[in-house]
Curated annotation (Swiss-Prot):
Function per UniProt: Hydrolase that can remove conjugated ubiquitin from proteins in vitro and may therefore play an important regulatory role at the level of protein turnover by preventing degradation. Cysteine protease with a preference for 'Lys-63' over 'Lys-48' over 'Met-1' -linked ubiquitin (UB) tetramers (e.g. Ub3 and Ub4) as substrates. Also cleaves RUB-GST fusion.
Domain OTU: 76-234
InterPro entries recorded: OTU_dom (IPR003323), Papain-like_cys_pep_sf (IPR038765)
Protein name from the UniProt record: OVARIAN TUMOR DOMAIN-containing deubiquitinating enzyme 3
Start and end residues of each stretch annotated as Cys-loop: 81-87
The species this protein was found in: Arabidopsis thaliana
One of the record's GO molecular function terms: cysteine-type deubiquitinase activity
Length: 234
């Protein structure tokens, strides 16, 4: 039981911090559904249709870890971000401004970060119709808390952003985002190299293209440097 709890906690931590993404898998067959105890899953993961029990569960999406790009160490400068609970949002607004050749002053950075936070709240909490466009984010949110609880907390400046907010903002802003970790945290021989390893990408569909409705935006690169803190890479 302790081993199972530890494993579940590890998965939840990866999802909260953006290291993992949900891949929804369902099984309408009794042989599979019955083998998974409903007591081990949140109630929101289970539904019944025409007598069949459908079990929806999270599978870690490790596509970046399998890709050649994920094996490559990349070098960037670290732009430190204030750790006041807004770090994810601050890093994003700084990165988007930097890509446009704009430098934000401290007050503008804070205000823009708070606007991003409230944009997440607006589409997820205040507009049920819009909410349906962000199903992956909804699953990431409700894996360990209710939507109501999330909506009570997201408006607070000290509520950290993570996986669900990245899923929303990459789509809402049509902004490609890649999250990195320091090279030494990737377990490469236990060394402390100066590079960074990409672990997850959001909004890849907005990285380029031509034609009506297409965008070609520069990537915003975020460094997850532990303890729920994000900095900007550039």
């Amino acid at each position: 039981m302790e081993l199972k709890s530890s494993s579940n906690n590890n998965i939840l931590e990866q999802l909260r911090n953006g290291f993992a993404r949900f891949e929804l898998v369902s099984s309408p067959t009794a042989s599979v559904s019955d083998s998974i105890s409903s007591t081990s899953l949140p109630a929101s993961f289970i539904s019944t249709t025409k007598g069949n029990s459908y079990v929806f569960f999270a599978r870690i999406n490790s596509s970046m870890n399998r890709s050649p790009a994920a094996k490559k160490v990349e070098k960037y400068a670290v732009d430190r971000v204030k750790g006041d609970g807004r770090c994810l949002f601050r890093a994003l607004v700084k990165g988007m401004a930097f890509n446009k050749g704009i430098t934000l002053n401290p007050q503008r950075e804070r205000d823009d970060a708070d606007e991003l936070r409230m944009a997440v709240k607006e589409v997820i909490c205040n507009d049920p119709k819009e909410r349906e466009k962000y199903k992956e984010a909804l699953v990431a949110i409700t894996v360990d808390e209710s939507l109501k609880r999330f909506c009570q907390r997201i408006g607070r400046h000290d509520f950290w952003g993570g996986e669900s907010e990245l899923l929303v903002l990459s789509k809402l802003c049509k902004q490609p985002i890649i999250v990195y970790i320091p090279e030494h945290e990737h377990g490469r021989g236990g060394g402390y190299g100066p590079g960074f390893i990409p672990i997850q990408e959001y909004g890849s569909e907005f990285r380029g293209g031509w034609g009506k409705g297409k965008t070609n935006k520069n990537v915003v690169r975020l460094l997850y440097s532990g303890r729920n803190h994000y900095d900007l890479l550039r």
